[in-house]
Amino acid sequence: ENIYVPQPNGQYGDEFYVTTDGGKNWTLLNDKMKMSSGGVEWITTASMHWCSSMAIDPNNTNKIMVVSGNGVFTCDNIWDESPEFYFFSKGIEETVPYDIISIPGGKLVSVIADYDGFVQDSAEEYGMVHNSVAGSMTGLAIAAKATDIWVKCGGSEEKPGFWYTLDAGKKWVNVTVSPFESGNVAYGGYVAVSADGKRFFWAPGNDSSIYFSDDQGKTWTKSNGGVGSKKIICDPVNPDYVYAASGSAFFYSEDGGKTFTQNMTLSVFAAARPVVAPGKEGVVYYPSMGLQVSTDNGKTFTRLDSLAACMAVGLGKGKTDSDPYTIFVWGKPTNDDSIGLYWSEDEGKTWSKVSDDQHQFGGLGNGYFVVGDMNKYGRVYMSTVGLGIVYGDLVQ
């Protein structure tokens, strides 16, 4: 039986005891011990829980390390009257990432399983967990022209799964109105938001339709078409255009997402995610039999001959402001190449490998994304199989 009791920060977690007489008597530590963040401020609202292992340092019997569900805590004075535990995880957090967005001139925002996601000034610094405390998140979108407006989705059968913020994550609002006519709880899936931030989109994970709202989730309308779409993205310039993809089709909308038309020329696979070119209208990249590119709002696509295979694509900052954006892919240029992370600085004409065969990180995992940084040239992020978000930098 699991018994959870209050810890010093008011959160409920495991009970911890010490004995100094070989186990004849035990002293509860929860009302005596102290806890600190160890410089990782998001942990201040968490507890030590799901403890699976503890180890005393054989060279220093005052020091003990405790494995918790959120990382590792260490105490250097376990035998004192008021021992202090501090968070000791430095980059070993085992998280399942679902998406990450690099805001041009702004922050880095992610969504993950279990712990909402993070808001960071840079990848090198510890960020803060979303204060929504909503749990597992599966989708994230940020308005291209109103970058303080973010939407995300997740939740479960017990809790409505759509959230939004109008102030860059300072305050999150949970939308409790279901888009379903039945009123049943909607959760999971993917989200999008128009470039001006005025229209929210949601393709719940427990439904096959796309819904949109013009009043921040107070009411929802079902889109016509786009059935089965689980990836949605809005044009970064023209709010009339919205793009969507399912496991078997690509769709585009010319009326702001009210109706979707299927593009009949593409063969797609379930995990493929469309990507739009930053600051450009109508330029869409889509993994399909290699990498496909559209310059007419998704109506027609042209395959890049320079790639034999592409499972994910992302765009990042160019070398200078006048240079085109960089393109990152998970795939391979020729059939003789190995699958991995590649990048192009010339709009896909030539490719250079970023990863190596010893560092594949299990592939793209649940999130199935490759994302370029919009503020640092040469930086790229990729999802993994339970290893968090991995990033790489160009070595000058």
Predicted regions and their residues:
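Residue-level marker for isolated small/hydroxyl-bearing positions within beta-strands
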Residues: 6-8, 67, 111, 152-153, ...
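Short glycine/acidic-enriched loop and turn motifs that connect beta-strands
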Residues: 9-12, 72-73, 116, 156-159, ...
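Conserved Ser/Thr-centered positions that define the repeating blades of beta-propeller domains
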Residues: 19-20, 75-76, 117-121, 163-166, ...
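Beta-propeller fold detector
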Residues: 27-33, 84-89, 129-130, 173-177, ...
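Conserved blade-ending motifs and adjacent loop-strand segments that build the rim/top face
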Residues: 36-42, 88-98, 134-137, 305-314, ...
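Blade-level signature of beta-propeller repeat domains, shared across WD40, Kelch, NHL, RCC1
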Residues: 363-396
